[in-house]
């Protein structure tokens, strides 16, 4: 066992430490004489260098095991050896971050008792455990100062991510660059680290009232604040300021007077300072447009042009270095960006022609739900997918929707709002509280969609499909960050199914259609939360309730009494079933599975009409064909499900209640006419000619219904397109700060 080996090694090492200095020297001379007869020259020099004799050397297998423990996450064995063998080594060694070899070798020199050959073999094993990404991103591969490395490690960064590796060289060398990478991959540090190193390398005499050398423009206040924080976290020599609306002008004026090296901000407030003559951008050397697709859109393009036009001259190589970053870069961005770029510029695209544009660490789910049922279903989704401890963001389309959702009683967790009408000071308090876990649910508009880096977010909910694919990609990217996995759930109505397919096509993702959380899912999640809450109850408090608990056990029995208590603690005293197909309350989804493949749902209707009473069949609605054509699923009122199961007797068709929504071939489209047509066709079919006539009539009405539906969809699509065009064309009239 490793523990015994480690203890044995330490016990062996303790004996020579207690010897006097003269005894130690005498014994070492004797050992060296013996070693001439038993070891080759390499081994003799190794013994003299380390001052450790052969009777102290543990077998290599033991040392290898100890070193492997060190190179994983546990270094206790190494620390104990170090403390015992080197009295001057008082402080406990910190964890080795991500297998950083240089740091490991530097710290390991403190322990002179370790065998050199074993040390080298351990380094080789450490090399083998590093991934290709870690090797390519090792700090030693880049001109990064020790001070910056130390600050990066303080932020938990132990190597550069792929986008940072690809962009470091061009940014550090002063080249213009357009970079695209998925959300959550570290784009901010992609320009922050090399710019800081470049400025610190060429740092001039610090003067008061010095003009900024770096300008970073961001579309939202929240993103600007976060980018500024990232800069501040990795430099102590440079002055970093952040200007955005909703905050005091005076504090920003004081920053200008004291001198700024790196200025981060939103276009509106920076333009205000320029027009007032307080801010001088004539000394700019580097310009960064973060979320460039939004910065160059009509809503911001005019303000960006007003801010930086004085620093740019046509086709001049003396123009500032221009760096453009985003997770989404449509082709028009590249065309518009050329007016700011030098003739030779670099392009880094880690998305490229890959099918999937969204983050690969996010699972995308879709739930069909009528808008009136949405708050209640979202409450259940939060409970099952996030629990009481997980963090979640709910995106809504309007500020009014955000407020209503956050205040809805179905959202049991503590939720806070974030949108443009909230005062900036409160927005900052809200974001700080969400980061620190003071509350678990943030309900927001698109102000929280871009750039916010909160790795602990487990779940993103989109209350409806967004109007454009870029919004979906950025919203879903608020989870699954920094190597973690996440879930994004999009709610939709039947008429929005086309929007969902459009997002799938353009973002390169596939939504997994799921039903609302089942009763068992809710019970399991709530009971786990209740059990966890019991751990916080002190023994002193428990003593007060022992008599009552004993009385309950005698009356109800231990299991029933505890089950009732857990149900009450979790707030789950009752459950009302919902349709897995549409999320409607008061319905149960059932499946009717065939032993053979069926052509369409009419086969199931025929079988139901043959086996069940007409009254029972009339209760069935929303029938859908299952994947593989091996049956159907449908909804019945909660009161009818048990009666249908009791009436059903058929060995070739299996009627059951599924725990989760099965995979569906054809989805219910919100129109009951098709179900009615199929029912009437088959029931009339038993009457001969009239049945065929009824079927034909139903077919004609069905075709008319479908044509009307398509016409309505086209009109609805034109309305949505018109809204988007109006929004874009009028964007330049808005003021962004």
Curated annotation (Swiss-Prot):
EC top class, as a word: hydrolase
Tissue: Highest expression in skeletal muscle, liver, heart, placenta, and kidney.
Phosphothreonine PTM positions: 247
Regions of compositional bias (Basic and acidic residues) in chain numbering: 38-51, 67-87, 117-131
Start-end of Basic residues biased regions: 720-737
Biased composition (Acidic residues): 11-20
CDD domains (alphabetical): DEADc_DDX21_DDX50, GUCT_RHII_Gualpha_beta, SF2_C_DEAD
Per UniProt, location of the Glycyl lysine isopeptide (Lys-Gly) (interchain with G-Cter in SUMO2) cross-link in this chain: 125
Modified residues (Phosphoserine): 41, 82, 86, 121-122, 518
Compartments, as annotated in UniProt: Nucleus, Nucleolus; Cytoplasm
Region (Disordered): 1-131, 668-737
SUPFAM superfamilies: P-loop containing nucleoside triphosphate hydrolases (SSF52540), RNA-binding domain, RBD (SSF54928)
Catalysed conversion reaction: ATP + H2O = ADP + phosphate + H(+)
Keywords of the record: ATP-binding, Cytoplasm, Helicase, Hydrolase, Isopeptide bond, Nucleotide-binding, Nucleus, Phosphoprotein, RNA-binding, Ubl conjugation
Motif (DEVD box): 290-293
Signal peptide location: none
Biased composition (Low complexity): 673-687, 702-712
Family (UniProt): Belongs to the DEAD box helicase family. DDX21/DDX50 subfamily.
Subunit record text: Interacts with C1QBP. Interacts with the ubiquitin ligase CTLH complex through GID4. Interacts with TICAM1.
Main function: ATP-dependent RNA helicase that may play a role in various aspects of RNA metabolism including pre-mRNA splicing or ribosomal RNA production. Also acts as a viral restriction factor and promotes the activation of the NF-kappa-B and IRF3 signaling pathways following its stimulation with viral RNA or infection with RNA and DNA viruses. For instance, decreases vaccinia virus, herpes simplex virus, Zika virus or dengue virus replication during the early stage of infection.
Protein name: ATP-dependent RNA helicase DDX50
Organism: Homo sapiens
Lineage of producing organism: Eukaryota, Metazoa, Chordata, Craniata, Vertebrata
